[in-house]
């Protein structure tokens, strides 16, 4: 029942040489109430929405999702309905699925992980004080299935080896060779 305390018992045996670790999480409901965020966005001159991943999702030794977590896609779609002057600042170490809302927002800045002065840097870019040159250091695909890495992240595979058979056709060259149009190309 909602609101009642839950008792959870976790037992496991670590049989590898790597440190033991247990991760717990939760899932957001699809009926999240965005009314307060929408109310504030509706009366703003401009909305800068910082979306992305955090250290619990994107870290060394783990695969991270291509989709934005925690209902961020839904929130972006709701905010742009009430204020079309919406800038989405993405904080992630690579590409993110933007196809659910990219055609509705006027601007996206892929800020990567900018560090402690990232807020100032983003403000300087958005105000026009600094020109970021609009160059991406990687290609952002439209779909995860378009990524050259996609086939290597199947947890059901028994063999966990990656064979680099693409030769020089990595990154943007691979997209060109296969005729895949990315969402945002390298450079």
Language-model regions, residue ranges each:
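C-terminal non-catalytic regions of proteins with extracellular/luminal or membrane-system context
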Residues: 1-187
């Amino acid at each position: 029942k909602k609101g009642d305390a839950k008792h959870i018992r976790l037992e496991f045996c670590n049989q590898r040489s790597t440190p033991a670790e247990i991760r717990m999480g939760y899932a957001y409901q699809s009926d999240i109430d965005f009314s307060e965020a929408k109310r504030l966005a509706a009366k703003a001159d401009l909305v800068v929405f910082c979306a992305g991943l955090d250290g619990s999702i994107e870290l060394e030794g783990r695969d991270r999702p291509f989709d934005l977590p925690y209902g961020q896609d839904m929130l972006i779609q709701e905010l742009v309905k009430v204020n079309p002057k919406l800038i989405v600042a993405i904080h992630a170490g690579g590409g993110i699925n933007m196809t659910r809302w990219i055609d509705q927002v006027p601007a996206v800045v892929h800020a990567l992980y900018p560090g402690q002065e990232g807020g100032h840097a983003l403000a300087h870019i958005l105000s026009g004080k600094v020109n970021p040159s609009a160059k991406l250091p990687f290609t952002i695909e439209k779909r995860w299935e378009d990524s050259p890495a996609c086939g290597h992240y199947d947890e059901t595979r028994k063999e966990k080896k990656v064979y680099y058979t693409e030769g020089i056709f990595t990154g943007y060259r691979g997209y060109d060779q296969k005729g895949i149009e990315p969402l945002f190309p390298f450079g």
